[in-house]
Every structure is written in structure tokens, then in C-alpha cells.
Swiss-Prot record:
Keyword Protease: yes
Species per Swiss-Prot/TrEMBL record: Psychromonas ingrahamii (strain DSM 17664 / CCUG 51855 / 37)
Catalytic site: 2
Function (record text): Protease subunit of a proteasome-like degradation complex believed to be a general protein degrading machinery.
EC number: 3.4.25.2
A Pfam match: Proteasome
Gene name of this polypeptide: hslV
GO cellular component assignments: HslUV protease complex; proteasome core complex
Protein name per its UniProtKB record: ATP-dependent protease subunit HslV
Domain of life of the source: Bacteria
Enzyme class (EC, first level): hydrolase
């Protein structure tokens, strides 16, 4: 279980996630990296769900991005098509949250592709907590996207036992600056 949250505001899109890997009620690892850059650093993907399943989907999504020259929407739709038709994929229990400088999508375990309202995405066991925090911060502050993601992850980590305080945060600045941050 995990928390992944993405916020788009101003000239940035930011995706952040915690680092906890749990097996049942036991914490197995505290510094896993669940947010990755893909396609020449132009796409950020975060995953939630079973680790092996999530990595399988991430690899397949990256292959779709390569096949479609980084077209995020096309890659997401093609992965969803595969997900629905490939028996081995249908058994995978994972979610992907993907974003580039133009759009954001959640790819669900049912093979659905959802473009979230207001380009705010949150998935995983702490997703609802992070989403609620991010909505409140977006509507009531002028904080930048990165700060909102940091605060939303911190709030989710204080509520959800399957989310920790070790975060990986990736940012695409539309002026083409790339920022990566891991912190505890």
C-alpha cells in the first residue's frame, strides 16, 4: 500500500509518493522508489499496489511510451487495451498515475484511463487523505505544486498506517527544468 499524489499548478506538474512497502501488517522496506521518470524525463509515473505487479505495468507503460514517441494519452490508452485483453495483465493489482507537461491520467486495475478533474491525482491506501489535503490547499492557498504535494503526503502519512514519511518527489517545470527530490 502507498500514497501517490500529483498536482498541476502554474508552470509545474509534480508527482510524489512515499517509500513504504508492506507485507500484510509488517513494514518490509521504508525507502522504496515508487515515482519514476520515463521517456527522456518528459513523463512522471507513480504506482500503487502490489510491487511486482506495479513494476510489470510500469515496464509495459514505458514500452508504450517508446512505441508512441512519448504521446502520453496514446500510451495510456494502448496499455489499457492490453490490460483488458491480456489474461496475465488482468490479474495484476496495481494503479498508475502518469503525467507530462500537458496532461495527467490514472490507469486503473480494470484497464480504465481516467483524466482527473483539475489534474489532481491521488492513488493508493493514503490517496483519499492526500487528495483531500491537496484540494484544500489548492482552493485556499497560493502554494506551488511541489509544496502542495509535500504537505499532502505528510498529511496522508500521519493518517494512513501504510504510508511513511520518506518521499520521492518529481517535478516537470514547463520551462524544462527537472527537479528530483528524495527526503526523509
Amino acid at each position: 500500500m502507498t500514497t501517490i499524489v500529483s498536482v498541476r499548478r502554474g508552470n509545474q506538474v509534480v508527482v510524489g509518493g512515499d517509500g513504504q512497502v508492506s507485507l500484510g501488517n509488517t513494514v518490509m522496506k521504508g525507502n522504496a522508489r515508487k515515482v519514476h521518470r520515463l521517456y527522456n524525463n518528459q513523463v512522471i509515473a507513480g504506482f500503487a499496489g502490489g510491487t511486482a505487479d506495479a513494476f510489470t505495468l510500469l515496464e509495459r507503460f514505458e514500452a508504450k511510451l517508446q512505441a508512441h514517441q512519448g504521446n502520453l494519452e496514446r500510451a495510456a490508452v494502448e496499455l489499457a487495451k492490453d490490460w483488458r485483453t491480456d489474461r496475465s495483465l488482468r490479474r495484476l493489482e496495481a494503479l498508475l498515475a502518469v503525467a507530462d507537461k500537458n496532461s495527467s491520467y490514472i490507469i486503473t486495475g480494470n484497464g480504465d484511463v481516467v483524466r482527473p478533474e483539475n489534474d489532481l491525482m491521488a492513488i493508493g491506501s493514503g490517496g483519499y487523505f492526500a487528495q483531500s489535503a491537496a484540494i484544500a490547499l489548492l482552493e485556499n492557498t497560493d502554494l506551488d505544486a511541489k509544496t502542495i504535494v509535500e504537505k499532502a503526503l505528510a498529511i496522508a502519512g500521519n493518517i494512513c498506517v501504510f504510508t511513511n514519511e520518506t518521499h520521492t518527489i518529481e517535478c516537470i517545470d514547463f520551462s524544462d527544468e527537472i527537479t528530483t527530490e528524495s527526503k526523509k
